[in-house]
Each structure stands twice: as C-alpha cells, then as structure tokens.
C-alpha cells in the first residue's frame, strides 16, 4: 500500500511537471519565433502543441497568425524564471517560404521544407537546422548562433554577420553567393558558380568544384576549398 501511494505521488509530480496545451492556428506560410522556444516542424495540418515544465507560463505564450505569419512569442510583461526547465513547441506545416528565429531558441525540421523561394533568418544565439528543397534560398545569420541547412537548392544567397556559423555543406547548390562579416564561418556548396566575400576575421570554405570562382578577402579571414 505504501509503495502504491509513493508511486501515485511520483506520477502526479511527473504530470504536474509536464504541462501540455494544444492550440488551433490558421493557415500560414511564414514562421516567426521570438524567444527561447524549442520548435520542431512536423508535416501536416492540425493543432500546435506546447509542452513545458512550468504550467504557469502557458498563459503568457502568444501564438497568433496575422498576414499569413505564425508568430510564437511571450507577452511583453513575461519574465523568465529558473523553474522553466524546457519549453517545446511542435508546429505542423504544409508550406513555408520564410522562417525567422530571434533569441536563444531553436527550430528543427525533420521533414523537408519545400519552397520555390525560401528565406531563413537567425538573429541571436539560437540554432536552426533545416532540410530543404528550394529553387532560391536566402540564409541570413546575425549573432552567435548556428544555421544548418541540408538538401537541395538552385541558388543560395548567404550572409553571416557576427560570430555565428552557416553550415551548409549538406545543401547541394548550383550557384552560391556568400558574404561573411565578422568572425563567423560560412561552409557552403556550389557546383556551378560561387561568389564569396570575407570582411573581417571569418572564413569561408566551399565544396563542389564550381566552374566559376569569384572570391575576395578584406581583413584577416580566409576563403578556401574544402
């Protein structure tokens, strides 16, 4: 009897420590995440699911669709506390043409993000890891985070500002144009043409043996073949 009571108490504690809430969202093709949310993209339609270690913060989380953009953020009055051990959001999607992350969170996609024109922007110390299939891809990184891309694209335009890294060896691109400003690194692939510029102490490494190479370094950085 005593063991049963202990197990019951432990189960109640576990349930209390794992608060979950489902929310309906409208159609969207853009995702804008602001804050320390760990977002996982999954295929399909359905409710958005929030899972957290602190049930009290659920009422402070904003999930709204406006102008075809799903924004996930906190209310302005919200203050982070040490009781929050994790904060996860599962987002079903059918089509995306823009993904933005600001802050220390993360965005990960298990399924491939298909788009004619895809724009990915990371600002801050967070991480983005996406598998994509896009005709035109624009990837911008400003801060200390990591932006990882894999899959296929015809044209890649990359920009790194700060100390973060653009990791795109796994993104098979035909034509790549990349600029690194600061101490960060850009790792890209180009099979046809590459235009690479380094301003500062950062590095660009490229693979793919492109037929046309246009490279220039201003500062102590370096551009090399991988």
Language model region names:
Residues 1-226:
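Intrinsically disordered, low-complexity terminal regions
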């Amino acid at each position: 009897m005593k063991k049963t009571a202990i197990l019951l108490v432990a189960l109640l504690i576990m349930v209390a420590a794992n608060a979950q809430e489902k929310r309906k969202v409208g159609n969207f093709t853009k995702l804008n995440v602001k804050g320390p949310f760990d977002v996982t993209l999954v295929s399909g339609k359905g409710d958005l699911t929030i899972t957290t270690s602190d049930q009290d913060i659920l009422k402070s989380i904003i999930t709204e669709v406006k102008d075809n953009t799903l924004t996930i953020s906190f209310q302005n009055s919200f203050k982070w506390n040490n009781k929050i051990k994790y904060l996860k959001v599962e987002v079903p999607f059918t089509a995306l043409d823009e993904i933005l992350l600001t802050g220390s969170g993360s965005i990960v996609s298990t399924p491939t993000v298909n788009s004619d024109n895809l724009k990915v922007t990371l600002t801050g110390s967070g991480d983005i890891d996406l598998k994509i299939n896009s005709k035109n891809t624009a990837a911008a990184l400003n801060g200390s985070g990591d932006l990882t891309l894999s899959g296929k694209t015809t044209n890649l335009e990359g920009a790194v500002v700060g100390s973060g890294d653009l990791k795109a060896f796994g993104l098979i691109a035909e034509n790549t144009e990349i600029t690194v400003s600061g101490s960060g690194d850009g790792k890209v692939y180009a099979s046809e043409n590459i235009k690479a510029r380094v301003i500062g102490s950062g590095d660009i490494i490229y693979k793919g043996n492109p037929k046309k190479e246009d490279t220039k370094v201003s500062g102590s950085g370096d551009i090399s073949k991988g």
